[in-house]
């Protein structure tokens, strides 16, 4: 390996990259596929549903700014892991990492399958996509993206920016089309907005459900806790990215929903499995076949950044001694190749074994549990270290509001649809102790793994990073 240049994760990403990264991470497939949860729990009241979308943006801003405090205070790739380790101990931090291994692999597997389904769907217009070609294409896309991610930040940068431009362009096209339909003033297009609040008003329980549905659509703002170590001037870059991306997402979400409601009736939206395709079929019948390809192309960016960001905590945990030294290595492109390889391998297994995907659906609620711990950590730090110099602070009401929302995201699924799978998920999280106690607490070393580490270093041309000057 050429050692003319230092091998380490470098701070090479600036404001524009960070903004596009946050945009992609928040805007997922939901706005294209099924943005109907808010409308359903708003009792198909158009005015209430749009108000919920706007209100959820404010709630999302509070939680995102809380995550920004963690990212700025600990500007390293995997700040969430380091924060948990500092304020709750190494055991909790390891269990968070253990959970994220399964959650991260499940996310990339689900995104790869969704990407494959939308890519193949136009070739099967009258039936569902066969499982075998869908899985084969998903595996191919997953490994292609993994290889591109391992090639370093240059490949990631141009692919991410191109994909984000495409995604925003598609949503802008949908939004502008809705505006044009409204300006034309046809009765069937404007009547739903002239009497937006005339429908039945939702009761408090349905309204809370609608808020949780909308809040989930804005999730993803905590992504800077995973890649802060590669941002230039994170203290100023992160807040600027947040205050650019989140208002833009809010406007886009509102305009896209208005466009859907302009072209389709609320009942048509609720009955559709892919609202964007139904919308295209109604607004531009001759171009409807393009929408699945456009959606799949935009979903490519989500898969790209999911692999990119989920590999960073693995790398940091290895630096902290909670994972084998093998995962603390970088290739000649200064990319954590072995961390990416582990994530892609686990994602491939999740694609092949579809029952694992079902289990991953129940793991998602653990993300809210970890978010609650992070918010408690912020409050704990303010109480235990009141004189600590913190470069960026949020109002205490922000973490408290985030705790309330996250508690609801944990409790409501348990109350609404109790399932034994949640017990399995808890056991899966706690099973991390079977590895933590012997290998980390008692520091048992496996000689054969150390030999394999040396062999893999030669095979993949990887090495330990140089000492950072920070």
Swiss-Prot record:
GO terms, biological process: amino acid transmembrane transport; aspartate transmembrane transport; L-cystine transport; L-glutamate transmembrane transport
One GO CC annotation: apical plasma membrane
Topology feature Cytoplasmic, residues: 1-11, 67-87, 150-162, 228-240, 309-336, 380-393, 443-470
Extracellular side: 33-45, 109-128, 184-206, 262-287, 358, 415-421
Major localisation: membrane
Highest taxon of source: Eukaryota
Distribution of this protein across tissues and organs: Expressed in the kidney.
Entry annotated with the keyword Transmembrane: yes
Gene Ontology MF, one: antiporter activity
Alphabetic keyword roster: Amino-acid transport, Antiport, Cell membrane, Disulfide bond, Membrane, Transmembrane, Transmembrane helix, Transport
Residue stretches spanning the membrane: 12-32, 46-66, 88-108, 129-149, 163-183, 207-227, 241-261, 288-308, 337-357, 359-379, 394-414, 422-442
Catalytic activity: L-cystine(out) + L-aspartate(in) = L-cystine(in) + L-aspartate(out); L-cystine(out) = L-cystine(in); L-aspartate(in) + L-glutamate(out) = L-aspartate(out) + L-glutamate(in); L-aspartate(in) + L-glutamine(out) = L-aspartate(out) + L-glutamine(in)
Localisation: Apical cell membrane
InterPro entries: AA/rel_permease1, AminoAcid_Transporter
Mode of membrane association: Multi-pass membrane protein
Quaternary structure note: Disulfide-linked heterodimer composed of the catalytic light subunit SLC7A13 and the heavy subunit SLC3A1.
Purpose of the protein: Associates with SLC3A1/rBAT to form a functional heterodimeric complex that transports anionic and neutral amino acids across the apical plasma membrane of renal epithelium. Preferentially mediates exchange transport, but can also operate via facilitated diffusion. May act as a major transporter for L-cystine in late proximal tubules, ensuring its reabsorption from the luminal fluid in exchange for cytosolic L-glutamate or L-aspartate.
Family in the record: Belongs to the amino acid-polyamine-organocation (APC) superfamily.
PANTHER family: AMINO ACID TRANSPORTER (PTHR11785), SOLUTE CARRIER FAMILY 7 MEMBER 13 (PTHR11785:SF238)
Protein name per Swiss-Prot or TrEMBL: Solute carrier family 7 member 13
Gene that encodes the chain: SLC7A13
